[in-house]
Amino acid sequence: MEDKKLSSAKPATSSKPAPKAPSTGTKVVTKPASGPRPAFKPGQRKPHASNASNDKVAFEKRNFTSGDKTKKPTDSKNPRFQRNNKDRKFVSEYEEKIVDIARVTKVVKGGRRFSFSAFVVIGNKKGTVGYGHGKANEVPDAIKKAIKDAHNNLVEVPITKGTVPHEVTAKFLASKVLLKSAPKGKGLIASSRVRAVVELAGYTDIVSKTYGSRSAQNVVKSVVKALLNLRTAKQIAEVRDKDVKDLL
């Protein structure tokens, strides 16, 4: 009986874990379960469910559609929407002439500093003229500033058959200018600085005379001042409350 009890008893198990087998350095990769292939191509980012509505809106904007209504595409003739808009140059109706360029020297503690000043006259040859002044360290920058300043100083002057309506005189500081009307075909009899103003203003026949200082800025400003003092026959008739025929 004792032998049977000993044979039927289970062997005692040790509490120590079994030793692990030495690793060979290879990793075991488990293959995913076989199933249907994804709808997107390999290497393509999987679309997120929350972005489905955004993708639809982007697709509608790209095709210029919004629901059932169709929007017209952007006007291709408009230069603002052209691809070569950066290369397109802005063409202004005003012509410009450089009257004077001067180099300015400023003496400072470290030495001398040089800069440039430009004086420019612009006009559209249709009764609008103006002048501007600009300063910069380089000549092109000074000219650009002068042109920009001239656009802010535009004035309108009267033109009667290509000449001034009547004789006029104006003075600015030490410069004085006389402008007279001339018959058709006479041309512009004026100095270079006076010619720059009257030609860009749109006059074709004028006789002028300059007195006193020949400074470029003073002469140009005196010419513009003289042109602003001009009055047409219609303007004078309105002031006197008469007809134009009575004045003539």
UniProtKB/Swiss-Prot annotation:
<comment type="function">
    <text>With S4 and S12 plays an important role in translational accuracy.</text>
</comment>
<feature type="compositionally biased region" description="Low complexity">
    <location>
        <begin position="8"/>
        <end position="23"/>
    </location>
</feature>
<dbReference type="InterPro" id="IPR005324">
    <property type="entry name" value="Ribosomal_uS5_C"/>
</dbReference>
<dbReference type="GO" id="GO:0015935">
    <property type="term" value="C:small ribosomal subunit"/>
</dbReference>
<feature type="domain" description="S5 DRBM">
    <location>
        <begin position="94"/>
        <end position="157"/>
    </location>
</feature>
<dbReference type="GO" id="GO:0019843">
    <property type="term" value="F:rRNA binding"/>
</dbReference>
<keyword id="KW-0699">rRNA-binding</keyword>
<keyword id="KW-0689">Ribosomal protein</keyword>
<dbReference type="InterPro" id="IPR018192">
    <property type="entry name" value="Ribosomal_uS5_N_CS"/>
</dbReference>
<comment type="function">
    <text>Located at the back of the 30S subunit body where it stabilizes the conformation of the head with respect to the body.</text>
</comment>
<feature type="region of interest" description="Disordered">
    <location>
        <begin position="1"/>
        <end position="87"/>
    </location>
</feature>
<comment type="similarity">
    <text>Belongs to the universal ribosomal protein uS5 family.</text>
</comment>
<keyword id="KW-0687">Ribonucleoprotein</keyword>
<keyword id="KW-0694">RNA-binding</keyword>
<dbReference type="InterPro" id="IPR013810">
    <property type="entry name" value="Ribosomal_uS5_N"/>
</dbReference>
<dbReference type="GO" id="GO:0003735">
    <property type="term" value="F:structural constituent of ribosome"/>
</dbReference>
<protein>
    <recommendedName>
        <fullName>Small ribosomal subunit protein uS5</fullName>
    </recommendedName>
</protein>
<dbReference type="GO" id="GO:0006412">
    <property type="term" value="P:translation"/>
</dbReference>
<comment type="subunit">
    <text>Part of the 30S ribosomal subunit. Contacts proteins S4 and S8.</text>
</comment>
<dbReference type="Pfam" id="PF00333">
    <property type="entry name" value="Ribosomal_S5"/>
</dbReference>
<feature type="compositionally biased region" description="Basic and acidic residues">
    <location>
        <begin position="57"/>
        <end position="87"/>
    </location>
</feature>
<dbReference type="Pfam" id="PF03719">
    <property type="entry name" value="Ribosomal_S5_C"/>
</dbReference>
<dbReference type="InterPro" id="IPR005712">
    <property type="entry name" value="Ribosomal_uS5_bac-type"/>
</dbReference>
<dbReference type="InterPro" id="IPR020568">
    <property type="entry name" value="Ribosomal_Su5_D2-typ_SF"/>
</dbReference>
<dbReference type="InterPro" id="IPR014721">
    <property type="entry name" value="Ribsml_uS5_D2-typ_fold_subgr"/>
</dbReference>
<dbReference type="InterPro" id="IPR000851">
    <property type="entry name" value="Ribosomal_uS5"/>
</dbReference>
